[in-house]
């Protein structure tokens, strides 16, 4: 049974809540191929949104995946759906703010794939809260710890593992088109940090044959963004694309970036903004 008609219908109903008169939904995604055949990838925040879409695109491309998330129930559900493809899929509960746990969890991940070399890390886990002037210190710490600090230290663990074992793999960081704008929220500030971290990792690891890049989506139809904008359709009205970007589109690019097709792309941030990058200060309000 083809699930696309049902998915499209639900998405249209969801988007209609934002008073949009017409949105064309295109869910074209990577078809089954062998671009990543036999490889092993860790994808943080892989239970929904962009993370899940990347995991699905990877398994369609022959990759074995380890997805992480904070909820065991959501992990089990995602693993169950991904397991219909002929690859290995494993889920691990991981809190991106608990840096002290990274070493042990990574060892357990290696055991789960019987010591096969893990050669792809996708840093996708992220959270968001309201921006200035309503951000609390607790929210600020949560965003920076999850989005930036966690990515930094997980990349450190994974990078050392690849260097020590002579693995010529990939690190792909999910940044954001918001990092093109002045930061007035902890989320945007964290994504500015991801930009810098991506460049630094790329420079440090290139000599070891490890390719590091970033992918920076614009407003994407993920549970996090749709929830945050449930009473505000500004994104759809102002974005030149005219609608939210679909996670599957971001996932398609992720496959290219970690495959041999993307080998010449190194230390780059690929922006998939839906036109957000050409908006002016007048298009995006800044105020308290």
What are these model-derived regions, one by one?
Residues 27-31, 266-288:
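Short C-terminal tail/terminal secondary-structure segment
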Residues 40, 47-49:
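Conserved glycine-rich cofactor-binding loop
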Residues 131-144, 235:
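Substrate-binding pocket helix/loop in short-chain dehydrogenase/reductase
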Residues 155, 190, 198:
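Active-site helix of classical SDR
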Residues 176:
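Residue(s) in the substrate-gating loop at a strand-loop-helix junction
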Residues 206, 211, 265-267:
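Short, small/polar-rich loop/turn modules that mediate ligand/substrate recognition or access, typified
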Residues 243-272, 277-278:
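C-terminal substrate-recognition "lid" of short-chain dehydrogenase/reductases
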């Amino acid at each position: 049974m083809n699930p696309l008609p049902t998915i499209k219908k639900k998405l249209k109903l969801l988007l209609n809540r934002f008073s949009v008169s017409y949105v064309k939904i295109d869910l074209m995604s990577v078809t089954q191929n062998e671009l990543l055949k036999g490889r092993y990838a860790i994808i943080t925040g892989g239970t929904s949104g962009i993370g899940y879409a990347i995991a699905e695109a990877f398994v369609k491309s022959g990759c074995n995946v380890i997805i992480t998330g904070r909820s065991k129930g959501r992990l089990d559900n995602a693993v169950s759906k991904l397991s219909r493809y002929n690859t290995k899929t494993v889920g691990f509960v991981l809190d991106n703010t608990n840096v002290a746990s990274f070493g042990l969890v990574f060892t357990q991940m290696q055991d789960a794939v019987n010591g096969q070399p893990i050669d792809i890390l996708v840093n996708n886990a992220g959270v968001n809260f309201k921006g200035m002037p309503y951000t609390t210190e607790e929210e600020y710490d949560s965003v920076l710890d999850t989005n930036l600090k966690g990515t930094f230290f997980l990349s450190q663990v994974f990078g050392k593992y690849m260097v020590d074992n002579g693995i010529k793999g990939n690190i792909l960081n999910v940044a954001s088109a918001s990092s093109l704008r002045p930061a007035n929220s902890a989320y945007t500030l964290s994504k500015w940090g991801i930009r810098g971290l991506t460049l630094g990792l790329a420079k440090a690891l290139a000599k070891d044959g490890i390719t590091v890049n970033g992918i920076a989506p614009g407003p994407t139809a993920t549970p996090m963004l749709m929830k945050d904008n449930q009473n505000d359709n500004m994104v759809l009205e102002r974005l030149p694309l005219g609608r939210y970007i679909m996670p599957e589109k971001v996932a398609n690019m992720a496959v290219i970036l970690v495959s041999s097709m993307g080998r010449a792309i190194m230390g780059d941030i690929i922006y998939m903004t839906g036109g957000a990058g050409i908006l002016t200060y007048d298009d995006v309000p800044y105020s308290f």
